[in-house]
């Protein structure tokens, strides 16, 4: 997050790579507030979620920014989530109909990709 003319600016450095945590951090950084908790938001949307999501200040090559730290409890053994497990988590979520439709489409693409390599 850069400050330009006293307001936050979201800068995405595509050449450095882009992932969901980076996008989440950028958007959450725009709304940064002591009254806003990413963990609480995640648990509100996905009640079964036991992960902690934290916005953390970061510096890369002298440029200040933010990143997301996502801490998930490690299950015992080698665990896989099936499409049915993910669908159940989505069913338990409080996502809007539009967000749910997008999430389902993303998971279907990922499931097909996983199936093609196994």
Model segments located where?
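Short, hydrophobic/aliphatic alpha-helical segments
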Residues: 1-11, 109-118
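N-terminal phosphate-binding or glycine-rich loops at protein starts, especially the Walker A/P-loop
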Residues: 2-52
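Glycine-rich nucleotide/cofactor/substrate-binding loop typically near the N-terminus or early
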Residues: 30-118
């Amino acid at each position: 997050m850069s400050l330009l003319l006293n307001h936050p600016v979201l800068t995405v450095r595509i050449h450095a790579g882009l992932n969901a945590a980076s996008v989440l951090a950028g958007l959450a950084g725009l709304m940064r507030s002591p009254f806003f908790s990413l963990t609480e938001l995640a648990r509100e949307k996905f009640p079964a979620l036991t992960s902690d999501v934290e916005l953390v200040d970061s510096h890369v090559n002298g440029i200040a920014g933010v990143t997301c730290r996502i801490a998930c409890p490690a299950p015992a053994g080698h665990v896989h989530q099936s499409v049915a497990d993910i669908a159940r988590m989505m069913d338990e979520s409080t996502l809007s109909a539009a967000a749910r439709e997008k999430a389902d489409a993303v998971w279907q693409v990922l499931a097909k990709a996983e199936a093609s390599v196994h």
